[in-house]
Amino acid sequence: MGSLILLFLVWYAMRTLQYMLPVAGHEDLVEIPDSVIRNLAAAALILLLYAVLTAVEKKAGDKIAIWCKRIAVTLGMLWQGIAGLCWVLAADRVPSADQASVIGAAIDFIQGDYGTLAPDHYCGLYAHQLGPAAMEEMLFRILGEADYHVIQIVFVLLNVAGIYCIYGILKEVSGRLAVVAMGTLLAGSCMASVFYTSWVYGEIPWVFCSLFSAWMLVRYIKYGKTGSLVGIVTALTLGTLLRKNTLVLVVAYCMVGAVRIFSKWDRRLLISLVLALALPLLCYQGIYKMYEMRSGMEHSRGLPTSAYLYLGMEEIGGRYGWYYSDCWAQYYATDCNTEQSDQIYREMMQERMQAMKAQPGYLRGFYQGKLLSQWNVPTYQSLYFNFNHGDVYHEKLAALEDRLSGDLFDSVVRMADRLQFIIYLGCLFYFIFCVRKDSEITQQLLAVAVIGGFLFSIFWEAKARYMYAYYMMMFPLAALGYGEIIRLAEKYCFFRKKKI
């Protein structure tokens, strides 16, 4: 399945691209033709660099190879750190939309105002947002003030740590200079990560927790240390509290862990699977109960799941499954009754599916358009959500950053587009050549999560921002995929020694 998914993404990423102009309040995608030749040339350049680094490793020896790996990961981390700090410190990028609502809820809770918990208010409507609101309230209480700038700095550090996690994964799984160096450098060059440092929401923690969990799982299988499992459970729990989409990774962890246990009994791994499932759910229930006790208000279940599923089936103005202003009208019409609105949304889903089936070719076109509007957007809405700012702290730097959403916007999109194609193609190589019956199943955690994320994006509300985390999970997979291509070439073609 993974090969088919990536073949689909590679085919369209090679020929077209979509972007969203950084204009607040207008989530309108523009689709334009892409350059097949330039995309293929970029991939060929990556393969050439892999070949060069492979030759260097053979001739230079292990000592120099180790230093080259360290230099590569240092460069990747430095770029993400410096670029991220410049992005968040040059100007005041004030939270808006969902992030502002969550921060506002945390501040209200500190002040003893629990109005947001009402069924028709933000945390009552989106009950899952109590997780990040509770975490931010705790942080603000520790700091003594509600300063979102601290969170932005923390996100920069998490980005840097994420690059090191990719380094750790590649070092443990492969160890080859080309794989480790190129994987960390490519991940370090991702501009979407830089732009999302100012987005005070769950995307950056979600990425870090995913990469950290994958690294710890590889280390556990290799070294057998219980601390690695503790790290996984902690990361998955925190990730789920901050961004509930992390549950896709939790399910992936349980799947690969279960397969591993069936083939080789491991009591500690089994316990970690149970805890990874139970702790996030228990923490959420504890948070719900805590706010019930503090506010004296009954916990609102909010929008039913069927509302998001119906939204993912709707088309408004050529936008497939994307949010629109009146999508929650049925919930409000039932006086915010979750059970009654759930029944209404289910009936609407059935009617919508029948209408889609009645139009020949529409169903295929709808879901193709929906998938591409999420996965074929190389910036993943990172500039769209983060281009705006308030006070300027460093005029020259802020002026340069403003140009990224102005006259340099096309260049940013094109660079991100080349990188996206490189990663998608490398990930395709990974699924074709690295996923084998005899491969260690626990090394496939991120691969299973990417497949799960793709399937999730078919049914749920559409948004390119939601795919950013899965894109970052692809970087170590792509690095290993290109490495396997070079290994096969080395074995069968170019680097084979001639017999005398």
Sequence positions of predicted segments:
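Loop-to-helix entry region of an early transmembrane alpha helix in multi-pass inner-membrane enzymes
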Residues: 126, 130, 134, 142-161, ...
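Transmembrane-helix motifs of polytopic, lipid-linked glycan transferases
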Residues: 153-174, 212, 426-430
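Transmembrane-helix signature of polytopic, membrane-embedded enzymes
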Residues: 166-189, 441-444
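Short acidic/glycine- and proline-prone juxtamembrane loop motifs at membrane-interface regions
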Residues: 192-206
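Extracytoplasmic catalytic/substrate-binding loops of multi-pass membrane glycan-assembly enzymes
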Residues: 90-107, 111-146, 344-345
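Start-transfer (signal-anchor) and selected internal transmembrane alpha helices
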Residues: 1-85, 269-277, 493, 500
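Membrane-interface anchor segments at the N-terminal boundary of transmembrane helices
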Residues: 29-43, 149-150, 369-447
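Membrane-proximal stem/loop segments at transmembrane-domain junctions that anchor or position
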Residues: 289-394
